[in-house]
Curated annotation (Swiss-Prot):
Monomer. GO terms for biological process: defense response to fungus; killing of cells of another organism. PROSITE patterns: CHIT_BIND_I_1, CHIT_BIND_I_2. Keywords: Antimicrobial, Chitin-binding, Disulfide bond, Fungicide, Plant defense, Pyrrolidone carboxylic acid. This is Antifungal peptide 2. GO terms for molecular function: chitin binding. Residues 4-41 form the Chitin-binding type-1 domain. Disulfide bonds join 3-17, 7-37, 11-23, 16-30, 35-39. InterPro entries: Chitin-bd_1, Chitin-binding_1_CS, Endochitinase-like_sf.
Amino acid sequence: QTCASRCPRPCNAGLCCSIYGYCGSGAAYCGAGNCRCQCRG
C-alpha cells in the first residue's frame, strides 16, 4: 500500500509522500512536481 492512498498525512513527521507512493525527504519526495501530499514534512 502506498502513502498516496493514506493522504493527507501518511508519513512520519519530517517526511513527504512522493508521486510514486513512497515516504521520504528531499526534493525527490518533497519538491514541486514530485510530492503527492504531506509536502512540508
